[in-house]
Amino acid sequence: QPYKLDSQLIQHIDTLIRRKLSPEQVCAYLCKHHQITLHHSTIYRYLRQDKSNGSTLWQHLRICSKPYRKRYGSTWTRGKVPNRVGIENRPAIVDQKSRIGDWEADTIVGKGQKSALLTLVERVTRYTIICKLDSLKAEDTARAAVRALKAHKDRVHTITMDNGKEFYQHTKITKALKAETYFCRPYHSWEKGLNENTNGLIRQYFPKQTDFRNISDREIRRVQDELNHRPRKTLGYETPSVLFL
């Protein structure tokens, strides 16, 4: 027999789905924080019924979004990164994920390449920092990265990034944070797949062609907080914030 959802439980489910949690994450959250045992198939069934009634709650499911792919043209990434150290020289401990403090960095470019976000993701906890960039100039990216990570300086050992020109002043980051920077092999973006995946989650909130100049810092912080307070299956349904902070 299908589980009968009462109005209070439905309110909980609606709130969590609107926060972009998957049905599996909703079940884990309800079990952990409200001692409610529910199977994710029950939530999918509820969402299907809700959709047939004309509701749009189902649109908050991540399955509705196309996979994120970085698409701002290879011309921006051409050239040789000054003082580049390749990922093949990165310490083995980074891949072992046995410590907190190894980060991946990337950018999400807005409409017409006129605006962008810098995204920083810690590899073990999935803790995410999102910053609005004034431009894609290397000096702006370096300044934003230092400003974002300075408060966590004792937990910044390495930062892995791609070969985009926006990261050409990575030595400023290294000097300010006393951390090492490493670069993926050209066209091997999967070597920092965690950040690529996180950017896909961020694109749920800010679709392609978003002009980030029109997005407030408060809104960006709201998205950052939602991601960091979302229970993750890979973390045993714990949240990045709890594990990192």
Segments (PLM) and residue ranges:
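Basic, flexible linker segments flanking DNA-binding modules
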Residues: Q1, I36-D95
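Charged alpha-helix within mobile-element recombinases
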Residues: S7-R19, Y29-L30, K150, T174-L245
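Mobile genetic element proteins and their domesticated derivatives, centered on retroelements
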Residues: I13, V26, I43, D106, ...
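DNA-recognition alpha helix
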Residues: P23-Q35
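Short conserved beta-strand segments at catalytic cores or DNA/RNA-binding microdomains
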Residues: D95, I108, G112-I129
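Two-metal-ion RNase H-like nuclease active-site motif
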Residues: I100-G110
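Active-site beta-loop-alpha junctions of metal-dependent nucleic acid enzymes
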Residues: V109-Q113, I130-K153
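Acidic/histidine-rich, metal-coordinating catalytic segments
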Residues: D154-Q169, Y187
